[in-house]
Amino acid sequence: MILALNIGNSNITFGGYTPDGKLVFSSRLFADTALSSDELLYKIVNMLALYGAEPQQITAVIFSSVVPALTPRLREALRKMCECQIMEVGPGLKSGVRIRMDNPAQLGGELLCAIVGALQRCTPPCVVVNFDTATTLLAVDSTGALVGGSILPGPQCSLSALVRNTAQLPQVELEARPRRLLGANTADCLHSGIVYLSLIHI
């Protein structure tokens, strides 16, 4: 099994894949920057067990991170967990994607992965969208090169700002699709507004 991980600003996401690329399971954990390497190891092993997998089944690991405080701890946890190849997606990795930006090293590993995945699925030119704490739009030209992008507040970031700066708007769960475009109560109105406004931005 190949284990793929991404440490984002809000979550650590996981995917377990067969060698031919079939997704077996996916999961996510809250990205707590206070976690030690042993705590990360404990959470990863328990997450694997939840899906009936064991560390010895893992033949390779690939990960990316935009949280520098957690990156070395995750690397250490993975080395303790399995004696397999561990690949970190970051500056210097030869992905085959030409990055025509002022500073290619600033491109997040998760965004590079998204571009590689998009080029496997469609013929450029295309726009690659990544929804996370920030929503990122990346423009890929007809040659498959990254030529620019835009960053805007992500759905959760927008929701948090509204809840924090208003007296009566509630925190709502954004994972599910809104039940209707026009909400009939405050929570549904907020849910619909955040999700559909994010789509309109694109």
Model-derived segments and spans:
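Short, catalytically relevant binding-site loops at active-site mouths
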Residues: K94, T133-T136, G144, P153-C157
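Fold-independent oxyanion-binding glycine-rich loops
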Residues: I7, S65-V66, G90-P91, E110, ...
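Gly/Thr-rich phosphate-binding beta-strand-loop-beta motif of the actin/hexokinase/Hsp70
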Residues: M1-V24, A118, P125-S142, L146, ...
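Glycine-rich phosphate-binding loop plus the immediately following alpha-helix
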Residues: D32-S36, L107-G109, A114-T123, V147-I194
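N-terminal glycine/serine-rich phosphate-binding loop of ATP-dependent small-molecule kinases
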Residues: M1-V89, L93
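Acidic-glycine-rich active-site phosphate/pyrophosphate-binding loop
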Residues: C84-G96, T133, L169-R180
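Glycine/small-residue-rich loop that forms an oxyanion/phosphate-binding "nest" at active or ligand-binding sites
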Residues: M81-G117
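Conserved small/polar residues in nucleotide/adenosyl-binding loops
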Residues: I200-I202
